[in-house]
């Protein structure tokens, strides 16, 4: 009798566990789409005479593509990555993240590695799902700064069918 009860108890708990999956799938920006977004964003900034770096990351903030234009300052490589990383991991434009953290009393989120509050990072969406992000750095403040960078990022995303 003890064996039968133990077997029934095991089956009662094992069956639901077996029905659960131990894997998951995630949708992310493809390399081809990342190249297209980066190229179109760079072209948009060039059209306005800006020399920038464009970085596209996947949904988890891992770098897919980086394009540094001739004449773009060296620091723009790191800053464009931080903008794209922030937009991908927080699922919002980096400027919006910057606005939100101004209201925080805890500065911890701002001190995380690769996070920035500067404008210029924009999520790439497929429907409502964030599948990546593009970050641009290099437009001087006198020419619109991060806000201009964000406009170039949006132009790059708009050129690609996702």
Predicted ranges, named:
Residues 1-8:
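Sec-dependent signal peptide recognition
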Residues 9, 14-16:
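N-terminal signal peptide c-region/cleavage motif recognized by signal peptidases
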Residues 20-162:
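Flexible, solvent-exposed loop/hinge segments and secondary-structure transition points
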């Amino acid at each position: 009798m003890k064996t039968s009860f133990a077997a029934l108890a095991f089956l009662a708990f094992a069956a639901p566990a077996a029905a659960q999956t131990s894997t998951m799938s995630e949708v992310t920006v493809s390399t081809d789409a990342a190249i297209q977004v980066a190229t179109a964003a760079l072209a948009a900034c060039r059209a306005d005479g800006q020399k920038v770096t464009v970085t596209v990351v996947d949904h988890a903030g891992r770098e897919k593509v980086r394009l540094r234009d001739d004449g773009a300052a060296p620091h723009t490589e790191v800053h464009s990555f931080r903008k794209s990383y922030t937009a991908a991991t927080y699922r919002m434009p980096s400027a919006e993240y910057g606005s939100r953290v101004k209201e925080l009393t805890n500065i911890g989120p701002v001190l995380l590695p690769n996070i920035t509050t500067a404008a210029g990072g924009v999520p790439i969406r497929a429907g409502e799902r964030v599948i990546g992000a593009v970050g641009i750095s290099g437009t001087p403040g006198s020419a619109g700064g991060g806000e201009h960078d964000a406009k170039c990022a949006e132009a790059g995303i708009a050129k690609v069918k996702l």
